[in-house]
Amino acid sequence: MQRDKVQRLLGLAARAGGVAYGEGAAEESVRSKRARLAVVAADASDNTKKRLGDKCAFYGVRLIELGDRYELGGCMGKDFAVAAAVTNAGLAKEILKQYESRDGE
């Protein structure tokens, strides 16, 4: 995973208005089928991870884990964020591509 690129792309998506911030907004975005990708902080509670993971599995949305709540929020211009949903399809695809790639390839 190329974390810096993923974080920059999340920031771009946020500036473009293509991100739903926070646990509740991310869940609602997944439930309403607007989300193309969901992101959860590594230090989110087990309950949050399970609830968002279950929603993503049910609605067919990919879920990734990225950094802690301060890293996740910081890359999107917030103090912190436990969860977020990317609604822009093109940026979600590129974020996922960078997340799955390995350094040096």
Where are these regions (language model features)?
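N-terminal positively charged helical leader segments and presequences
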Residues: V30-G53, G60-R62
